[in-house]
Amino acid sequence: MYRAAEYLITAGHAYVDEQSAEEIRINRGDFSRPGVDSPFRNRSPEENLTRFREMRDGGHLDGSMVLRARIDMASPNINMRDPTIYRIRRAPHHNTGDKWCIYPMYAYAHPIEDALEQITHSICTLEFEDQRPWYDWLLARLIEGGLLTAPPPRQYEFARLNLTYVITSKRKLAALVYDHKVSGWDDPRMPTLVGLRRRGYTPESIRLLAERAGTSKAGGWTDYSSLEGCLRETLEEVAPRAMAVLDPIKLVISNWDAVIGVDADGNGRLDECSAPVHPHRPELGRRQFAMGSEVWIERGDFMETPSKGFFRLYPGNKVRLKYGHVIECTGCSKGPDGAVTAVHATLIPDTKSGTPGSDNIKVKGVITWVGVSDGLPAEVRLYDRLFTEPQPDAGGRDFLASLNPDSLRVVQAIVEPSLAQAQPDDRFQFERHGYFVADRVDHTPAKPVFNLSVGLKDTWAR
């Protein structure tokens, strides 16, 4: 990088400018008027080289002078009006420490690094289109001087992939972190790689989105549901299934002992049930769980007075406990405040899934459940979109005003025993709910924590 700068000076393609930053800005001109040559533009290469080495050796103050490329101050492309390529800045570098007090500018370092790393196609977004003439000019000069070899990298521009309900500005994302609107850069609601990974997004799902979105010179917006759809598609064939009750209420089966029997101690026997780990991959085997006289069900699966089209539990209605028996609801218990505290039912004999005659009784509703005897308590974090507006910062508006107050809801759930072996980053489909991942930071076998990656359906499309 430094050798290239010295070459540009000796070849007459660069000079040291001692104007202030404000003078350089004013004299660069704008789209309506050409720039004005610096009074230092026509120094000899020898004098410029001496000055540049003084900059390198710490002989001048920060901001007192810069190295600029000598191109064309009347160019209609402002990027070609003698851009700054080196400046004085006394700041430690994470690799070289205090060895250097001059540093190259990004626009100068970028094409050189591409060439040194043998990049053939430098891909960037449309805002860099006006930078391409400078990119090509610099590489051509360095090839002429023998510092780089032909052919040079080629820069190609395409439109940015904009997702609705997402911001990608680093400054605005930093504001979310530092204002404690999120828990950190790896918060599962953040569009950072660490955030997406913690949310449960897979590399395959992100690649699939990029492939489907394609590249274009025209800017546009991709709906966030497209990303969610790609994740569902990639997880559908690989995610093991499990049952989980996110808002548990106890279901008490009053005739359990009479139908299933009791053990030697007079306690109701447990009935072992099983289900495939994955419905389309029998080679993965089956998972085991027990049903007893008490099981956990979703509070929303019971209505004392059902609405039209409600086919789950209400007094007098029959449903199937998935992978288990058919039951008939007989009523409920309530607390002093009138809230339902338990649901009551009776077991219909000879209806266990997979047994002869189990389908003799037809039901319209099938609900998931977890046994009281072997269910595991777990923290479940229900994540949603971070913003309520498709374009939170459109038109320069305050993006914080459209933060979604319901973007995170934490519930205490009960999950089936097969999840006792879940490890951080393991992904599952919780039947009827969606795809979940064991949190890579907080999950332990002793204290399970699962994050909602994506629901089974797009709820925002309603």
In which residue ranges do the predicted regions lie?
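Active-site cores that bind ATP or allylic diphosphates and position pyrophosphate for catalysis
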Residues: 3, 7-173, 231, 240, ...
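Short, compositionally biased low-complexity segments
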Residues: 23-29, 108-111, 178, 198-210
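Flexible, glycine-rich loop/tail regions that form catalytic "lids" or insertion modules at the edges
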Residues: 75-79, 149-197, 202, 207, ...
